[in-house]
UniProtKB/Swiss-Prot annotation:
GO terms for molecular function: orotidine-5'-phosphate decarboxylase activity. Its EC number is 4.1.1.23. The keyword Lyase applies. The gene is pyrF. CDD domains: OMP_decarboxylase_like. This is Orotidine 5'-phosphate decarboxylase. Keywords: Decarboxylase, Lyase, Pyrimidine biosynthesis. One of its GO terms (biological process) is 'de novo' pyrimidine nucleobase biosynthetic process. It comes from the Bacteria. One of its GO terms (cellular component) is cytosol. Homodimer. It comes from Methylobacterium sp. (strain 4-46). Substrate binds at residues 16, 38, 65-74, 123, 184, 193, 213-214.
Amino acid sequence: MTEPLTPRDRLIVALDMASRDEAERLIDRIGDAAAFYKIGYRLGYAGGLALAERLAASGVKVFLDLKLHDIGNTVEEGVQSLARLGAHLLTVHAYPQTMRAARRGRDSVPGSALRLLAVTVLTSYDDADLREAGYAGGVADLVASRAAAARDIGIDGIVCAATEAAAVRAVIGPDRLIVTPGIRPAGAASGDQKRVVTPAAAIRAGADHLVVGRPITEAADPRAAARSIVSEIAEA
């Protein structure tokens, strides 16, 4: 049986910086206020994968937000390589062929604890963006259909905006993860996110993990900012 998540376990700090050195300095400043970090494209291509391996070896959880999407064989082999780094979470786009390939890749690595997350609709998108991209329906419909596909294929969890978390939970059930980006403490600027929610509201909506970037990484005191968000999670 999985142990209950502590408030600190629920916070994932987004390391959206340009170099490994910069990321490591931030991790040092945050200290024990967080123990879960997200590495995406920018840092991933600038020493982030080596950093992910080091952090995982030291017991820190790592979320590789690489949003893989390619032909099946390429995704399968890429996930095999990433699973060996020791990361805890990895994102793939919620297309059936991509998700099945990711599962094959992960399952082929003995002892891998990697959990796969399907990206439904990016939190920078709204209904107008989907119409521009050629989709007939809106965000809510596309999120629900992609979440159902991920559930049926056996993906471990879903990445979605907290505004969709309750609806996604109804689709995927209680045992799969929901990870929500676009989290901003009360009063913080929304930046380039269009569907933002406070930490407490996201937890109440059913999210398991919250991804927070600039409110922590650009704070004068990142450790205090992380602790404040953990406190808000605890009070939800």
